[in-house]
Amino acid sequence: MNRSEKPQLRATTVLGVIRNGKAALGSDGQMTLGNTVIKHSTKKIRRIQHANLITGFAGATADAVTLLDRFDEKLQAFGGQLERSAVELARDWRTDKYLRRLEAMLAVVSADKALIISGTGDVIEPEDGIVAIGSGSMYALSAARALIRYTDLSAREIVTESLKIAADICIYTNDHIVVEEV
C-alpha cells in the first residue's frame, strides 16, 4: 500500500428476506482494515422498535450510524411510514453537502417491505423481497434466491444459511452471524 493511500475499511454482508409474512435481517461480524481483520463481532444490525423494522448497514461505520440516526428521525417525523421516510432520507442524502460524502448503504426490512437505500441516495425495492448489501452481498443474494425457490426454510433460516455460504466465499465476510426477525 502506498503511504499516501488511505487504508480502506471493509466489512460486511447484510441480507434480508421476507417470507410467509415474516422478515429476517442478518449480517456477519467481520471488520477489516486494509488486509487485516480488526474485529470479528461488529454489530451491523439495529432494531427500530417504534416502527417495527430492522436496519442493517454496510460501509464506513460512523457514516452508517449517522444515516441510521437520520433515518430514525424521518421515521418519527412521518409516523413510521417506511417508504416515505426512506425517500425523504434519500432526498436529503442527495442534496445535503455533508450527507453526500457519507460512504454507506442501508438495508431495511419490515414484515411486508424490503428496501435498500444506496450510497447514491437511491431507494430500491427488490421485486423478490430480498435485500443484500456489502462485500459478500451477491453470494448471499444468490444463495437466498436458491433457498427460497427450492426449500421450505423460514426467513431466519434462509438468512442464516445464505450468510454462511457467503462467508465460505467472501474474504471480507465471517461466520459470526447475527439475525433479527420482525
From Swiss-Prot:
One of its GO terms (cellular component) is proteasome core complex. The keyword rRNA-binding does not apply. Belongs to the peptidase T1B family. HslV subfamily. NCBIfam families: ATP_dep_HslV, PRK05456.1. GO terms for biological process: proteolysis involved in protein catabolic process. Disulfide bonds: none annotated. Its main location: cytoplasm. It is found in: Cytoplasm. A double ring-shaped homohexamer of HslV is capped on each side by a ring-shaped HslU homohexamer. The assembly of the HslU/HslV complex is dependent on binding of ATP. This is ATP-dependent protease subunit HslV. GO terms for molecular function: metal ion binding; threonine-type endopeptidase activity. Allosterically activated by HslU binding. The keyword Metal-binding applies. Keywords: Allosteric enzyme, Cytoplasm, Hydrolase, Metal-binding, Protease, Sodium, Threonine protease. InterPro entries: ATP-dep_Prtase_HsIV_su, Ntn_hydrolases_N, Proteasome_sua/b, Proteasome_suB-type. Pfam families: Proteasome (PF00227). The active site is at 12.
